């Protein structure tokens, strides 16, 4: 006997199905209607029978897409966000506050007054001070063209230190300049002490003392487990000359090849102690000047001194010291490949400089 087409199809499907049927079907035990008529009530987290109202399941999770805010959604004053703003680790408040919504018509003035009164009552004074300081730090970093990572590191250092008793009596400018210098050291962004000093009206001695205090505070808090900051870059002393060279070469319009040659000179000048005791800026200026002479570039020592904020005599004196050890500080591959020649370097003497024959 042949089976109907529908029955044969069901038999074929059941024959292909292997293993247990894991489909979960929720049905009402009271109504016993199939297919069941159930309703998901996400507001209560329940699944109920639409016929008798019996709760079939509870504590369900709403898997639908969340409300989203688009650029033009605030035209009517509505904000669909239900989770509030993201927490800011640089502030101390928990950011859990009640916000009074906007009203239309005659109630607008009342809600505005309520918002003003509430803001005065719940504002955290400490957070206000931190935000004002962060705004000043951001402005100073922007003036020095520092990247965002330096700003964040400086703000983190400021938050850890600004309430310390040992900083009482120190000016805010000296503290901010010091934390910016800390941020530069942590992010390995080359900035000299003189460049940071130019952002403030504070004496160099005061910033130096404040920087030492902040450095000790951060190291102590890190050792005690109150902070997780790598202080190795902060406590290593002066920034190396090689970190300044790429930026100053860029300001002078020099190529990468010249910058690399200057970095090589600055790095290997330490091996012969030819410029021992000189500041990193002085070493960088002398190395850049020597590299420009090697490549026969028309860059005067006056221009280099103005760019690096040193005297012209400092540039020439540094070059004179490097010239005496030129075979040890200049990259030998440049000479061997014929890219540059020793004759390109002006010969120096105690009296004057003259061109080598």
From Swiss-Prot:
Can the keyword Transcription be found in this entry's annotation? yes
Which family does the similarity line name? Belongs to the TFIIB family.
Q: Which cysteines are joined by disulfide bonds?
A: none
* Organism of this sequence: Kluyveromyces lactis (strain ATCC 8585 / CBS 2359 / DSM 70799 / NBRC 1267 / NRRL Y-1140 / WM37) (Yeast)
User: What InterPro entries would the database entry show?
Assistant: Cyclin-like_dom (IPR013763), Cyclin-like_sf (IPR036915), TFIIB (IPR000812), TFIIB_CS (IPR023486), TFIIB_cyclin (IPR013150), Znf_TFIIB (IPR013137)
> Which amino acids does the record list as binding Zn(2+)?
28, 31, 49, 52
Q: May I have one GO cellular component term?
A: nucleus
Q: Where is this region: Disordered?
A: 69-90
Q: Which GO terms describe its biological process?
A: transcription initiation at RNA polymerase II promoter; transcription preinitiation complex assembly
In the UniProt record, does the keyword Metal-binding occur? yes
Annotated coiled-coil positions are: none
Subunit (UniProt): Associates with TFIID-IIA (DA complex) to form TFIID-IIA-IIB (DAB-complex) which is then recognized by polymerase II.
Q: Name one GO molecular function term.
A: RNA polymerase II general transcription initiation factor activity
Taxonomically, the superkingdom here is: Eukaryota
Keywords of the record, alphabetical order, are: Metal-binding, Nucleus, Repeat, Transcription, Transcription regulation, Zinc, Zinc-finger
Primary location group: nucleus
| Name under which the protein is recorded | Transcription initiation factor IIB
Q: Where does this polypeptide localize?
A: Nucleus
